C-alpha cells in the first residue's frame, strides 16, 4: 500500500457535490468518510451535524468514495443529510489512507493547500463527540 498523501491542492482533491459542482474549501474542513451500507455511519449522521454553532470554525462534510451518485443522493435524502454537505470522491479515500468507514479526517487549510492533520476511525457516537470536542478545543486555541 502506498504511503498516504498528507497535502493536497484544492484541485487535486477530486471532490464534488451531489449536483456535480466542484468542491473548494474556504476553511479548515472535517470529512466523515461514510458508506451507504455502513450501519455505524447511519447512527452518526444526526450527531455529526448537531451543535454546529459551537464549532463554527469547522466545516463538516460527509464524503462517499466509490459509490454511485444516485445511490448517495437517495441515501442523503432518506437520512436527512444537508445536500450542500455531502460530497462524492474518486480515489481520495485511498490516497488519504482511509481503510474503513466511518473515518473522520481533519484537514487544515493554508493558502491553496489542505494539510492532513489527523484521520481516526469512529466506532460510535461517543467517540464522534469526543473527537469533535477535541477539534473544537484545538480550533479555539488556534492549534488545529
Describe every region a protein language model picked out.
Residues 1-21:
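N-terminal "domain-start" segment that seeds a small globular fold
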Residues 10-12, 84-90, 123:
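Short acidic-hydrophobic, aromatic-tinged amphipathic segments that line or gate anion-handling sites
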Residues 20-42, 48:
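Short active-site neighborhood of thiol/selenol oxidoreductases, capturing the structured segment around
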Residues 27-28, 43-65:
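Conserved helix-turn-beta segment immediately C-terminal to the redox Cys motif
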Residues 48-51, 72-76:
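Hydrophobic packing residues within well-ordered alpha-helices of enzyme cores
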Residues 57-73, 81-89:
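Thiol-based oxidoreductase modules, predominantly thioredoxin-like and allied folds used
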Residues 78-108:
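Short, internal strand/loop/helix patches
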Residues 105-143:
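Non-catalytic, surface beta->alpha helical segment in thiol-disulfide oxidoreductase systems
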Amino acid at each position: 500500500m502506498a504511503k498516504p498523501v498528507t497535502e493536497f491542492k484544492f484541485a487535486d482533491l477530486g471532490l464534488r457535490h451531489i449536483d456535480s459542482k466542484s468542491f473548494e474549501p474556504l476553511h479548515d474542513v472535517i470529512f466523515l468518510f461514510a458508506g451507504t451500507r455502513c450501519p455505524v455511519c447511519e447512527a452518526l449522521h444526526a450527531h455529526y451535524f448537531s451543535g454546529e454553532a459551537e464549532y463554527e470554525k469547522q466545516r463538516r462534510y460527509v464524503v462517499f468514495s466509490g459509490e454511485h451518485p444516485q445511490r448517495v443522493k437517495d441515501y442523503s435524502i432518506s437520512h436527512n443529510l444537508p445536500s450542500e454537505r455531502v460530497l462524492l470522491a474518486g480515489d481520495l479515500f485511498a490516497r488519504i489512507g482511509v481503510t474503513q468507514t466511518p473515518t473522520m479526517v481533519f484537514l487544515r487549510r493554508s493558502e491553496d493547500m489542505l494539510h492532513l492533520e489527523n484521520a481516526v476511525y469512529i466506532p460510535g457516537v461517543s467517540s464522534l463527540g469526543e473527537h469533535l470536542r477535541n477539534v473544537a478545543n484545538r480550533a479555539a486555541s488556534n492549534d488545529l
